[in-house]
Amino acid sequence: MTENRKKLVEVKNVSLTFNKGKANQVKAIDNVSFNIYEGEVFGLVGESGSGKTTIGRAILKLYNIDKGEIDFEGETISKLKGKSLFNFRKKAQMIFQDPQASLNSRMKVRDIIAEGLDVHKLVKNKADRDAKVQDLLDLVGLNKDHLTRYPHEFSGGQRQRIGIARALAVEPKFIIADEPISALDVSIQAQVVNLMQKLQHEQGLTYLFIAHDLSMVKYISDRIGVMHWGKIVEIGTSDEVYHHPIHPYTQSLLSAVPEPDPVLERQRIHKVYDPVDELDGQEREMREITPGHFVLATEEEAKAYKKK
């Protein structure tokens, strides 16, 4: 199904280590590979410290990778410099996890949203600039009265909408949403996700949606990658990963998702993942268990998974 679609982002055998050579070095990404196809939402899920945010930042070249290659529209991101890097920044944007920290508290909303327009010279004059900002506010469900306010005057959900408007201002092809709802109240989370889904369908955007909530990732994503200890352990369609998880870590994540039905919640069996198998020294690689469903496994483990 995905083979005939255009690859927008290709992550190939990427590794990244922080504090390399020091006593406190951390291998944040360990030989990770995946593709993101044009027009899809690729969900990346895992617990805190799994490396999912680091992957997102590496794709935007906010971190320099140690090994491997990241391509965007066929161009290697690590080789981009000067004008080519400047143009890439316009095509790929990020929605940050903390809407409060990611907005300049001393700038008005009008200027926050218009900053990308100014940097990339996408407007001709002040009237054009104001009209464009107003259109973006309308798009995310805010109004013109908000233009002259500061970030601290808004709720968390409204601030995240401002962050979304800022990301959309330069008309990107690709947006990395780094846990965009984790800092929001539960009642607001669905509103923001529905807004992102609506904008994605209307504008043909491609998302990398990073989160730790598997049920929310399933709701918005076409395909899901599951990360643990810097490695991707499972990739498949959202339905396959959610309803037919194969890797023990994915199964443990899903077993922790609460059930709204109290009867089912009492019957739910929690699966505790034992990572000791990952430390046995054996080489593991992504292997296709069912069509389009890949799991990090040895050859023997893959055979066992296929029999289940």
UniProtKB/Swiss-Prot annotation:
It is a peripheral membrane protein. It is found in: Cell membrane. CDD domains: ABC_NikE_OppD_transporters. Its main location: membrane. PANTHER family: D,D-DIPEPTIDE TRANSPORT ATP-BINDING PROTEIN DDPF-RELATED, TRANSPORT ATP-BINDING PROTEIN. Belongs to the ABC transporter superfamily. This is Oligopeptide transport ATP-binding protein OppF. It comes from Streptococcus mutans serotype c (strain ATCC 700610 / UA159). The gene is oppF.
